């Protein structure tokens, strides 16, 4: 008999445009405050329930893929996947405190390791 298992890295819901704007603004404000000079431009884009965050630098014509956030109805409790260049895909991850859910800013901090 099949059984159901909770996965924080599946499903989700598409955030409304106002929520998308707030999430984008939060990420950009956090990046400008804490990582100024380490990137030229941060790109935040949405596709369905997912929010992709990339950074552009002068040293590379291609973007640095940082993280992919998943919106589950609460912009303060999102899940995320870290982009691994060794496998060239997003891998589900947990936040620094071990939780599956956290803020967009906390997810950006983890992805920003590529900016150092």
Describe the function of each predicted region.
Residues 1-22, 81-116:
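Mixed-charge, Lys/Arg-enriched low-complexity segments
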Residues 2-61:
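Negatively charged, low-complexity tracts enriched in Asp/Glu with abundant Ser/Thr
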Residues 54-82:
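Short, conserved beta-strand/beta-arch hydrophobic-aromatic motifs that form part
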């Amino acid at each position: 008999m099949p059984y159901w298992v909770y996965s924080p890295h599946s499903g989700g819901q598409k955030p409304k445009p106002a929520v998308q704007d707030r999430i984008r603004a939060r990420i950009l404000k956090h990046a400008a405050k804490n990582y100024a000079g380490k990137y030229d431009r941060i790109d935040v884009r949405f596709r369905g329930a997912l929010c992709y965050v990339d950074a552009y630098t002068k040293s590379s014509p291609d973007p640095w893929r940082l993280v992919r956030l998943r919106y589950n109805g609460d912009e303060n409790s999102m899940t995320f996947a870290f982009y691994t260049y060794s496998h060239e895909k997003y891998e589900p991850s947990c936040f620094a405190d071990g939780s599956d859910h956290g803020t967009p800013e906390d997810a950006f901090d983890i992805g920003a390791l590529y900016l150092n």
